[in-house]
Amino acid sequence: MKSVVFRDTENLEIIETKLRNLKDDELIIEVANCGVCGTDFHIFNGHSHAKKNTILGHEFAGTIIVKGIDCNGFEIGDNIAVDPNIYCGKCDYCKAGKIQFCENHKALGVTEDGGFAEYVIVPTSQAYLLPKEYSLSDAAFAEPLSCCIRGIDQAEIKHGDSVIIVGGGTIGLLMLQLAKLAGASKIIVIEPNEKKHKYALELGADYILSPDRINLLYEANKTTNGGADKVIECVGSPDAVTLSLQLIKRGGTIVIFGLAPEGKSIKLNLQEAFKKELTIKTSFLNPFTFGRAIDLLINRKVEVSSIPVTQLGFDSITEIFSTSYKSNTLKYQFTNKLKETL
């Protein structure tokens, strides 16, 4: 089968690979769609870790074509979305319910072969059944949505809170919808790319501000009456985190969601943080949230079909890693159904 294999930093190869032997509680999935995540770019650029010679891709959905003998509840032909994060259930963190810190954590598309391939082996524990009519392209958003749910949980948004979302890409648009569901009364999205502004407005943002505006802080403070109750940072850069610290009101909560390249840091004004009684949280992985993501998607409480997706086949998937990632495209998805895409 064709696969996109991570060899080393800035080195991806499209090669023929073979599936390993199937275990009794595993499924073989024909991949329909697999989202390209910012983490994939971090891995490619050497800013995040993955096991060498692993097939990348961790945001995927597809159809069961083979099942092991111990796969009750699943049938050949079923469509599924896949939670890539595999926890041991035995370490102290898992026993304490903090599975995101599992000492033996594995992830499809990072430490184990993932979805940038024609086929992938998936444990039944990671497979979530989908309605037959539900779009597999939309289902591939389940993994990033499940991570965003964790971020929203960390924010602890209360009814009537003002929320600023820093970054209007795919993650920001998912966070925007989750913030509305959580009861936020006023949501501001900060995004420099004007071509992305309309999507945030369509999905319910009350205001859009550009970080390049000279009076950004004045406008944000005026709109939120002195700062937001919650700020959710969805960029993964020191500048975005520093801006978040300036946008939060006294007693507010900041959630640092974006994954910054390894080694990046910020300067924190300790006295300002002290006087504001800030709560600063981070959000890691998707503990116990994947099922919630599936429910939100299939019940159309979170809308992803309006987020523009560029579909890429094997002939062009590696090109986006070797060219500039800064583009107007909100979401790339790999699909092995395409022969030519660019």
Model-derived regions: residue spans:
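Short Gly/Pro-enriched turn/cap motifs at secondary-structure boundaries
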Residues: 7, 18-19, 51-57, 108-112
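Glycine-rich cofactor phosphate-binding loops and adjacent beta1-alpha1 units
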Residues: 155, 203-277, 340-342
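C-terminal hydrophobic helical "lid"/dimerization subdomain
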Residues: 3, 242-246, 287-342
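Mid-domain Rossmann-like dinucleotide-binding core that forms the NAD(H)/NADP(H) cofactor-binding site
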Residues: 135-214, 218
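Glycine-rich beta-strand-centered segment in the early N-terminal region that forms part
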Residues: 20-34, 47-92, 131-133
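Short glycine-centered segments of the SAM/dcSAM-binding site in methyltransferase folds
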Residues: 79, 162, 252-253, 279
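Residues in the short beta-alpha loop(s) of Rossmann-like NAD(P)-binding domains
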Residues: 193, 260, 286
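NAD(P)H dinucleotide-binding glycine-rich loop of Rossmann-like/cofactor-binding domains
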Residues: 88-166
